[in-house]
From Swiss-Prot:
This is Large ribosomal subunit protein uL14. PANTHER family: 50S/60S RIBOSOMAL PROTEIN L14/L23, LARGE RIBOSOMAL SUBUNIT PROTEIN UL14M. GO terms for cellular component: cytosolic large ribosomal subunit. It holds the Pfam family Ribosomal_L14. Binds to 23S rRNA. Forms part of two intersubunit bridges in the 70S ribosome. GO terms for molecular function: large ribosomal subunit rRNA binding; structural constituent of ribosome.
Length: 122
């Protein structure tokens, strides 16, 4: 469950290490984002020679949450922290590698590229 001002780790190789959620997209009153939702983020911590710089604003898709995601069979998939993958204006991943597992809920038309790059799909 991600809301405005939430800090997230970055699960790709764009050079960003930490981002801050500045908006949850999908309606004017929408408060929370879960796995598979798109948010606007600001880069708070970045590697010196990375593809992105500190202070830049990007779209991102949430790939892991500590709150977890409930499946249809009643199981709950939780992670140790919150993580996102940075996206460009066409909602394609900026990075060429994904670090850590992602959930099966990302397996939609829009995010198949992220699922195929991920080392593990839970």
């Amino acid at each position: 469950m991600i809301q405005t001002e939430s800090r997230l780790d970055v699960a790709d190789n764009t050079g960003a290490k930490s981002v801050l959620c500045i908006k949850v997209l999908g309606g004017s009153k929408r408060r929370y984002a879960s796995v598979g939702d798109i948010i606007k983020v600001s880069v708070k911590e970045a590697a010196p020679r990375g593809r992105v710089k500190k202070g830049e604003v990007y779209s991102a898709v949430v790939v892991r949450t500590a709150k977890g995601i409930r499946r249809g069979d009643g199981s709950l998939v939780k992670f140790d922290g919150n993580a996102a993958v940075l996206l460009n204006s066409k909602l394609e991943p900026i990075g060429t590698r994904i670090f850590g597992p992602v959930t099966r809920e990302l397996r939609t038309e829009r995010f198949m590229k992220i699922v195929s790059l991920a080392p593990e799909v839970l």
